[in-house]
């Protein structure tokens, strides 16, 4: 990479979650794009081709998982909320709405390792999670 892109990457690494969220919003406004739309396109691509052979491969070993918050202990709501914020990078209000809407998909297309780690983290603080 060029020196300029290395510097930008280093700057991005130092951002807090709140700053990163604000940056995403500014990029969306400046370039007329949506971060959510990009994720939808990525999610649609694996199912787009292959037909029966793709279904056979999926039956062998699934590589992408959706992490779904099914429910949570009311006393642990704040802890679950913090874990959801850490996993998604959402702001407080957005994460709160997501948690309160359980059952709700909190992460789509996660690798097996990431999905399992997130499931363990949320269950450790009082949430009930399923992987699909």
Swiss-Prot record:
The keyword Ribosomal protein applies. Forms part of the ribosomal stalk which helps the ribosome interact with GTP-bound translation factors. Is thus essential for accurate translation. SUPFAM superfamilies: ClpS-like (SSF54736), Ribosomal protein L7/12, oligomerisation (N-terminal) domain (SSF48300). The keyword Coiled coil does not apply. Belongs to the bacterial ribosomal protein bL12 family. Homodimer. Part of the ribosomal stalk of the 50S ribosomal subunit. Forms a multimeric L10(L12)X complex, where L10 forms an elongated spine to which 2 to 4 L12 dimers bind in a sequential fashion. Binds GTP-bound translation factors. It comes from the Bacteria. One of its GO terms (molecular function) is structural constituent of ribosome. Coiled coil: none annotated. Keywords: Ribonucleoprotein, Ribosomal protein. Signal peptide: none annotated. This is Large ribosomal subunit protein bL12. InterPro entries: Ribosomal_bL12 (IPR000206), Ribosomal_bL12_C (IPR013823), Ribosomal_bL12_C/ClpS-like (IPR014719), Ribosomal_bL12_oligo (IPR008932), Ribosomal_bL12_oligo_N_sf (IPR036235). GO terms for biological process: translation.
